[in-house]
């Protein structure tokens, strides 16, 4: 009986310290070519400021495509396909990542995800 109680107690402790990484995107919508959209990503379950963050996208029937990244110090990186049109930013105090997308094209149509 004592062993069983110890096991249950150990499981309870482990569950209590478990944290779940969550990344929740918002801000998408329909827009005409040439228009703009701003995406947001709310992060939780980890020390946001300690990680480089990324945006990736997936068009229907295609694989994942890297869209942008931002370092812990705020330094941005872009592939040529979006450079000059997309701007990544972060707000560490709010555990938030953003993607401002301007001069949108039909080829930008995709599901966008933030990633750690």
From Swiss-Prot:
Cystine pairings recorded for this chain: 41-114
Tell me which GO cellular component terms the UniProt record holds: blood microparticle; extracellular region; extracellular space; immunoglobulin complex; plasma membrane
* Region of interest: Framework-1: 20-44
The record's region (Framework-2) falls at: 53-69
- Report residue spans for region: Complementarity-determining-3: 115-116
GO molecular function (one): antigen binding
What are the start and end residues of every segment in region (Complementarity-determining-2)?
70-76
GO annotation, biological process: immune response; immunoglobulin mediated immune response
| Keyword terms, alphabetized | Adaptive immunity, Cell membrane, Disulfide bond, Immunity, Immunoglobulin, Immunoglobulin domain, Membrane, Secreted, Signal
Q: Where in the cell is it found?
A: Secreted; Cell membrane
Looking up InterPro entries in the UniProt record yields: Ig-like_dom (IPR007110), Ig-like_dom_sf (IPR036179), Ig-like_fold (IPR013783), Ig_V-set (IPR013106), IgHV (IPR050199)
What quaternary arrangement does the UniProt entry report?
Answer: Immunoglobulins are composed of two identical heavy chains and two identical light chains; disulfide-linked.
Q: What does this protein do?
A: V region of the variable domain of immunoglobulin heavy chains that participates in the antigen recognition. Immunoglobulins, also known as antibodies, are membrane-bound or secreted glycoproteins produced by B lymphocytes. In the recognition phase of humoral immunity, the membrane-bound immunoglobulins serve as receptors which, upon binding of a specific antigen, trigger the clonal expansion and differentiation of B lymphocytes into immunoglobulins-secreting plasma cells.
What is the name of this protein?
Immunoglobulin heavy variable 3-13
